[in-house]
């Protein structure tokens, strides 16, 4: 069973990476290049995540792993907010074009980028913004299993909290290659398998949820 799951993950990752490579070639390092509608919506989602981390952290310096980092927009926002001296940032993505772009264009001592779906060591916070929205499969069962198993891997490596956002609808579904979850379902999944789960919404993002799962201190 593990072997089959591993093969499925590899195939899904290859399909996702192929779609993003084509998109990035057409739109470069813009919100459209990573399937976001606009700079406003992309940056709002990322700022919500940063604000959540800042509300939780107590230490002077923290480490963040950004899963599905794309062209590194989260790090750019961290710099724009003058937080770069406070944060050790690790950007991860399954797409080599994104990682290559980030390595060439972002050169900071406390920043690194690498291929992967989870960090190579424990960090304080692991975040995913839009990472599981776009899906190459129409099978809800296959995709939710993929998402859950990725969350499990990252939960083990998050020292303080796991924070991610997702699209929501009244019913869980895949529509136009986008995965929509349902509020009560995703909250129950996270609480039953991980820990205390906080759901937050923003009035400018009516179809989004931001989910924060905190580790016991």
Question: Which residues does each predicted region cover?
Answer:
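Conserved SAM-binding strand-loop segment of SAM-dependent methyltransferases
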Residues: 107-118
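A short SAM/SAH-binding and catalytic strip from SAM-dependent methyltransferases
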Residues: 125-144
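Class I S-adenosyl-L-methionine
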Residues: 174-217
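Conserved beta-strand signature within the Rossmann-like core of class I S-adenosyl-L-methionine
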Residues: 158-166
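Conserved alpha-helix/loop element of class I SAM-dependent methyltransferases that forms part
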Residues: 40-59
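Short "lid" loop at the C-terminus of a central beta-strand within the Rossmann-like core
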Residues: 133, 167-172
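N-terminal, positively charged/glycine-rich alpha-helical extensions of SAM-dependent methyltransferases
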Residues: 1-31
């Amino acid at each position: 069973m593990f072997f089959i799951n591993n093969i499925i993950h590899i195939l899904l990752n290859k399909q996702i990476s192929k779609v993003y490579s084509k998109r990035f070639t057409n739109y470069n390092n813009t919100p459209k290049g990573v399937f976001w509608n606009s700079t406003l919506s992309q940056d709002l989602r990322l700022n919500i995540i940063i604000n959540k981390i800042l509300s939780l952290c107590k230490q002077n310096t923290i480490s963040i792993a950004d899963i599905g980092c794309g062209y590194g927009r989260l790090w750019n926002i961290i710099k724009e907010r003058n937080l770069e001296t406070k944060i050790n940032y690790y950007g991860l993505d399954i797409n080599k074009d994104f990682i290559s772009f980030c390595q060439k264009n972002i050169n900071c001592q406390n920043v690194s980028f690498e291929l992967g779906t989870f960090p190579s060591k424990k960090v304080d916070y692991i975040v995913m913004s839009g990472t599981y929205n776009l899906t190459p499969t129409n099978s809800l069962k296959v995709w939710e299993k993929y998402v859950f198993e990725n969350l499990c891997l990252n939960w083990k490596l998050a020292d303080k909290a796991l924070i991610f956002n997702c699209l929501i609808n009244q019913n869980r579904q895949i529509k136009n290659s986008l995965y929509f979850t349902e509020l009560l379902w995703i909250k129950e999944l996270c609480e039953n398998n991980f820990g205390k789960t906080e759901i937050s919404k923003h009035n400018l993002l009516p179809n989004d949820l931001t989910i924060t799962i905190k580790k016991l201190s």
